[in-house]
Amino acid sequence: MRERKETAMSDKEKKGAGAGAQVAPAMGPPVLINKEDIPAVLPILPLRNSVFFPGGVLPLAVGRQKTIALIKDAVRDEQVIGVVTQRRAEEEDPGAADLYTVGTVARVVKLLKMGEDNYSLVVQGLARFKVLELVQESPYLKARIEAVEDRSVVDDVEVEALAINLKKLAREVIELMPELPAAATELVESITHPGHLADLIAANVDVPIEEKQQVLETVELKARMKLVLELLNRKREILKLSNKIDSAVKGEMSKTQREYYLRQQLKAIKEELGELGEEEEELDELQERLKKAGLPPEVEKVAQKELNRLKSIPTASSEYTVARTYLDWIADLPWTKRTDDNLDIENARQILDTDHYGLDKIKKRILEYLAVRKLKNDMRGPILCFVGPPGVGKTSLGQSIARATGRKFVRLSLGGVRDEAEIRGHRRTYVGALPGRIIQSMKKAATVNPVMMLDEIDKLGADFRGDPSAALLEVLDPEQNHAFSDHYLDLSYDLSKVMFIGTANLLDPIPGPLKDRMEILELPGYTFEEKVHIAQNHLIPKQLREHGLSADAIAISEKALIKIIMAYTREAGVRNLERRIADVCRAIAVEVASGKIGASAKRSIEEADVLEILGPEKFYNETAERTEIAGVATGLAWTAAGGDILFIEATKMPGKGALTLTGQLGDVMKESAQAALSYLRSKSDSLGIPVNFLEKTDLHIHFPAGAIPKDGPSAGVTILTALVSLLTGIRVRSDVAMTGEVTLRGLVLPVGGIKEKVLAAHRAGIKRIIIPARNEKDLLDVPEQARKELEFVFAAHMDEVLQAALEENPVGRKPPAAPEPEGEKKPGATPTPPAKKPDEIRV
């Protein structure tokens, strides 16, 4: 426990005397002890934050076990002790190196027990001594000492002059300190021994411990008095200047300034007493952090102004917490710290290839950036946006880019964000205000040039609180983001060195201005072969590690893997594929844990094992079954998951020419169906369909998966093909899928999402795909492996579509002859039975 020092003065005399204040017990010379009465070995009492002089009286509170044992022995044996100041006050168990070499012989004149392990005592200084060596460390310190005797002539003229000057200076200092009582002057005047006078003044003047110790170590009287004169003179000048400043400031001091002044005085007193509070230490630490943060000049000016204001605010005030938190944010943000880019192109290529299979266009763009960055050091960070279905590796690709460039990676999820303040932050006037997510992410990154991923940027919302996508315009604008302004900081922050990467499943929901600021890079769905490669080289090893299985524990055959991909997943990415592989790993883990197979045994997974572990197949190729009757065609649709096949069913029934559409269709798709029907009616004669087929017939077109909304013009050719198949009785080929917009003249117009639609058809086992002729160029984006396994028909007119899609070309067929009315039959003619109509087939 730390010893606590007080003074031996009365309450009035204590005020303003400072730490470790000591007074003489009498007016005459100090209490002396004969040199021969001082033992050669003394118990040593270490003293903190004070220097004890001969002739002084000092009360102490002790609690350390070593000190208590020392005091008890000294009182019992009526022996003197040695009081020596510690070099470092925080040292709890000082040794020889932690103590000064000159101390004061003292006698314990009073001892009181204050508690179980606390004592209060009063010691009286007798003489100086010098520590020669420590001879004992337990149970307390003992040292071999040498008494130091001052043999100076007291009645020397120079000594007398020095004493007069000392008393004069002491009176001036006391007058400059009105808080001291008048008795202080009387005490100084009453002391006649010059050595005692010098020691008393040195003990009570407010100077550093090191300078007081220097006075104690100065044995020769004249030198000691001159040293004290120098200390006292410096103290007088400081007090004069302080009083002058006080007089100038107090005249215009407001309540806040007065409070600041008092707190500064309190801080100085606490420092002198060794009781500096945590708040002051924290503020000093905060100031040091701000110095090391490398702040720009304008930011440093604001921070210093706020810090000065903080020092004048009471710690109990809520404003103190607000200002302190604000400065913490400024100190914690990276202003100049950056990570060096790894510009090794081959190393970056190797990292990207190791982490991701395929995605050549994305990898090429990243390597281009690194190449330009290598040639031009001050290049701004690119702003990319990866658009693709779930599970194709958009987020993990951002992590790989950070690893390849050697930068920090931070991810900012924007899904569901509707408040503009989430991006820009709240102003400090609000309770609990914080910076926006951009600044929070920069603090987390701790560098000015991280890779920052803006995940799910297409799922930003907007409401009465503002539009977050509009706030992102400044963030993602290379011409503005060097001075991004967060509402909380209210300072310019440079984001120009950040590499921003956005991710989205859909491009359409992203506002135009925001889309314009980003370089769009589309990630296609994986082909069948790519999924097999990814599973074998990435997913299976990863799941084996996560399930505690050795690399040789499972051998999933390629046939089994194909079965999992074809029968249990139907996706553009590989997320569900990874889940199914995890299911297999868990099944093997159960067998290993239950002892059915050895931990080192290798388990082979075949197709039959897949069925046993994963259960019934969830997906199967149904195009042949669905299109085995006339009136059903297979279309291609674009979805957020990357693309899918879409069956369109048409049927007819007796009626008056009504057209019914079902399947949660949007207006555009309904209009496409109406346009297809109009074209069919205009060309019915050339397709072998009766001209008046709608007079007594109703048509119903249905799009299965009725719970899912559908819209868009690209189903036009599929609707028309299904209607032609229905009305002619010619089936659509089961291995054909199609997409395209149809006009009233039968032209096939280009549509979007070709890459996703082609990959969806490839996954579903389609062999022939009919697409608009003007979409031929879009096949360059389709992976080469998929292009090789598919047959493409590029159609510019519906005649080409029908010729490629139907099992028999209906173009040019003649419609069946209409039967003669019964009333016009010739007498005696034999009635001919009507031929079987092809449109009698029902779905």
Swiss-Prot record:
Function: ATP-dependent serine protease that mediates the selective degradation of mutant and abnormal proteins as well as certain short-lived regulatory proteins. Required for cellular homeostasis and for survival from DNA damage and developmental changes induced by stress. Degrades polypeptides processively to yield small peptide fragments that are 5 to 10 amino acids long. Binds to DNA in a double-stranded, site-specific manner.
SUPFAM superfamilies in alphabetical order: P-loop containing nucleoside triphosphate hydrolases, PUA domain-like, Ribosomal protein S5 domain 2-like
NCBIfam families, sorted: lon
PANTHER family attached to this UniProt entry: ATP DEPENDENT LON PROTEASE FAMILY MEMBER
Record-listed ATP binding positions: 388-395
Naturally occurring in which organism (per UniProt): Anaeromyxobacter dehalogenans (strain 2CP-C)
Source domain of life: Bacteria
Induction of the gene: By heat shock.
SMART domains, per the entry: AAA, LON
PROSITE patterns given in the database record: LON_N, LON_PROTEOLYTIC, LON_SER
Domain Lon proteolytic, first and last residues per copy: 627-808
Subunit structure as annotated in this protein's UniProt entry: Homohexamer. Organized in a ring with a central cavity.
GO cellular component: cytoplasm
Lineage, highest ranks first: Bacteria, Pseudomonadati, Myxococcota, Myxococcia, Myxococcales
Full protein name: Lon protease
Family: Belongs to the peptidase S16 family.
Region (Disordered): 1-22, 805-843
Top-tier EC class: hydrolase
Composition bias type Basic and acidic residues, residue spans: 1-16
Cellular compartment(s): Cytoplasm
